[in-house]
């Protein structure tokens, strides 16, 4: 079964229930959210009543809580060797894992981090040490996201992810989130997704892939830019992304859209329809703007 959804907001007054309602309005059967702003440490207390109502509504709509994912905030950088920033990142990630547990969500997506000039190997060592401190304290599975290689990002190659995972003690609590834009910008050919998956399989990592971020890219392959584009409107292209979404080896894995808003309006309902129909809609952007404008009148 196709599991398709998008990033949605997690708001103070509605929390998980509100995130679910928005996802359902897009025609989603999975979704992703941050438990607070990704750029700061401000976090609201989790409301158990809202969580319970959301869980009931998920069952009514045949949505499995196991298919919902949380994204860790960007300010966490496990690769940074600066002692105070490193300790902050470890402690904050532990808190985020705990929030996932309270919500009943078992997967947390993490950008591995940036080595900030210390070198990839030092960055990888820092990430491994941090994960070996964090994972024994949580039931949450941390999914390392494939990165575009912007700046000093770690995790830009499959081999770097392999090295991190090999160093982690509790391997059952570590996984991978593919990002199609990041892979393409990192110089992988999304048009040959099977070769990419063959490489994961060669390293015994295929079963570690637990989520896919489906994004087109504004930039050409190997650009190391990380600028997402709407499905079919970028350099990767609609057919190549459809081949990822419907690839048999990625079946039953949540596919999450993180594509940009169009003039302030969410594109996800129409993008999901397009994906389900497997037919590119070259008028999608205009239609999103029209629907959004009509609602605001």
Predicted regions and their residues:
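Active-site acidic/histidine proton-transfer and metal-coordination neighborhood
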Residues: 78-175
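N-terminal pre-domain/capping segments
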Residues: 1-70, 78-95, 281-297
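Conserved, mostly hydrophobic/aromatic
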Residues: 23, 71, 89, 100, ...
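Short, electropositive alpha-helical surface patch
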Residues: 82-95, 120-132, 157-167, 193-199, ...
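Acidic (Asp/Glu)-rich catalytic clusters
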Residues: 20-27, 47-69, 94-104, 132-139, ...
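Active-site beta-loop-alpha junctions enriched in small/polar residues
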Residues: 7-11, 36-38, 73-75, 113-115, ...
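Conserved active-site loop/cleft motifs that coordinate metal ions or position small ligands
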Residues: 32, 210-213, 252-259
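Acidic/histidine-rich catalytic cores of soluble enzymes
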Residues: 133-229
């Amino acid at each position: 079964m196709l599991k398709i959804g998008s990033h949605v907001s997690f708001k103070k007054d509605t929390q998980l229930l509100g995130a679910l309602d928005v996802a359902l309005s897009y025609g989603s059967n999975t979704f992703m959210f941050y438990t607070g702003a990704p750029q700061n440490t401000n976090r609201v207390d989790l409301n158990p009543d809202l969580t319970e109502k959301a869980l009931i509504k998920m069952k009514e709509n045949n949505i499995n809580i196991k298919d919902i994912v949380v994204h860790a905030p960007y300010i966490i950088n496990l690769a940074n060797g600066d002692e105070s920033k490193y300790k902050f990142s470890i402690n904050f990630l532990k808190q985020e894992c705990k929030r996932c547990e309270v919500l009943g969500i078992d997967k947390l997506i993490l950008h591995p981090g940036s080595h900030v000039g210390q070198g990839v190997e030092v960055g990888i060592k820092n990430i491994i040490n941090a994960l070996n401190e964090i994972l024994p304290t949580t039931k949450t599975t941390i999914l390392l996201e494939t990165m575009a290689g912007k700046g000093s990002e770690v995790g830009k190659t499959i081999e770097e992810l392999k090295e991190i995972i090999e160093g982690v003690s509790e391997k059952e609590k570590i996984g991978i989130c593919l990002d199609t834009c990041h892979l393409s910008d990192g110089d992988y050919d999304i048009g040959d997704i099977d070769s990419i998956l063959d490489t994961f399989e060669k390293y015994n990592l295929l079963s570690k892939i637990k989520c896919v971020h489906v994004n087109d890219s504004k930039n050409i392959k190997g650009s190391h830019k990380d600028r997402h584009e709407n499905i079919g409107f970028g350099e990767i292209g609609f057919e190549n992304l459809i081949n990822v979404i419907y690839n048999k080896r990625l079946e039953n894995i949540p596919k999450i859209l993180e594509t940009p808003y169009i003039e302030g309006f969410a594109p996800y309902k129409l993008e999901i329809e397009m994906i389900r129909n497997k037919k590119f809609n070259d008028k999608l952007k205009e239609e999103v703007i029209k629907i959004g404008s009509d609602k605001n009148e």
